[in-house]
């Protein structure tokens, strides 16, 4: 039976790739034993159990970029997380460990590497994080989502890098527009816009969306807008004077991404790598608003890549206003031919086969490990049998004494 340990957390961008990988393994190996390692406060504590997987939690937090007392406390949490991860790995005895990013995956991958357990990193972004760069030297394999990210890894990891793309959840890949619209009670004739600012929401996008929502209500356009849980009450208070119709929904968090994405004609969102993988897998035109504070400014790079290929429009946060977003939305909705061209461009970027490529690489590592283990076990068995034969054919010291002590007659 295959035993797999996955770790990734903090944001949906790290959790959902792990879910996609776990689902693929479970589909191919129904008897596989799969567990996740995350934190109690991370979004993984809500998402992982919903997909029917066991979640073990550890205490760990990411570091702030400035040096302060809070960072000192986080150092102690890191050591605690390392010890907790070590115990989980030791007890579960996984055949393979897979990390999909977020601060929680670091201690897990580190302990796997130190324990000589095959370990794989999946890097979603074009600019790998510091932890993944360091661990890439010790893990078995590094799966990447952007080919140009390879130049940003250490030279010691060069032979371990494999370009696979970002995995998209099966329910999204299998979703269809007509069925999704029926599920959401949205007629085929209506134009429909989906907007979300990542798993935690975006205040910048929320501020700009108030005007857009007002005008979409006036134009009788269907929409689903996810504000982020922490912003929901505030946002709903700010649009209390607007009467929404049943097919015009504002929600704190998007539980059913598959139907919402499939039903849409236009998507507005941030430039997280997984969000873009999902958008392009279904061939959706988009308005991409990269978050400005991301590491290495990788979201801006992602957004400009989408725009350069004609699949979307990028609006930087510093240029985002209610008016600029409203203009972009209604220009696109008013030009069906342009939307179709953008949709086709988006579809060519999408990599729906990524999950199969990732699974193949995982199985290569797993199978090679099993062969090595089998050879080792066979060798140990042979050595044991040789020792037994030698023991049976070699007289003991006591036996030798008795033989020497026999007197000749």
UniProtKB/Swiss-Prot annotation:
Its main location: membrane. It is found in: Cell membrane. One of its GO terms (biological process) is cell wall organization. It is an enzyme of class 2 (transferase). Its EC number is 2.4.1.227. Signal peptide: none annotated. It catalyses: di-trans,octa-cis-undecaprenyl diphospho-N-acetyl-alpha-D-muramoyl-L-alanyl-D-glutamyl-meso-2,6-diaminopimeloyl-D-alanyl-D-alanine + UDP-N-acetyl-alpha-D-glucosamine = di-trans,octa-cis-undecaprenyl diphospho-[N-acetyl-alpha-D-glucosaminyl-(1->4)]-N-acetyl-alpha-D-muramoyl-L-alanyl-D-glutamyl-meso-2,6-diaminopimeloyl-D-alanyl-D-alanine + UDP + H(+). One of its GO terms (cellular component) is plasma membrane. It holds the Pfam family Glyco_transf_28. It is a peripheral membrane protein. UDP-N-acetyl-alpha-D-glucosamine binds at residues 11-13, 125, 169, 199, 299. InterPro entries: GlcNAc_MurG, Glyco_trans_28_C, GlycoTrans_28_N. Keywords: Cell cycle, Cell division, Cell membrane, Cell shape, Cell wall biogenesis/degradation, Glycosyltransferase, Membrane, Peptidoglycan synthesis, Transferase. Pathway: Cell wall biogenesis; peptidoglycan biosynthesis. GO terms for molecular function: UDP-N-acetyl-D-glucosamine:N-acetylmuramoyl-L-alanyl-D-glutamyl-meso-2,6-diaminopimelyl-D-alanyl-D-alanine-diphosphoundecaprenol 4-beta-N-acetylglucosaminlytransferase activity; undecaprenyldiphospho-muramoylpentapeptide beta-N-acetylglucosaminyltransferase activity. NCBIfam families: murG. Belongs to the glycosyltransferase 28 family. MurG subfamily. Cell wall formation. Catalyzes the transfer of a GlcNAc subunit on undecaprenyl-pyrophosphoryl-MurNAc-pentapeptide (lipid intermediate I) to form undecaprenyl-pyrophosphoryl-MurNAc-(pentapeptide)GlcNAc (lipid intermediate II). This is UDP-N-acetylglucosamine--N-acetylmuramyl-(pentapeptide) pyrophosphoryl-undecaprenol N-acetylglucosamine transferase. It comes from Clostridioides difficile (strain 630). The gene is murG.
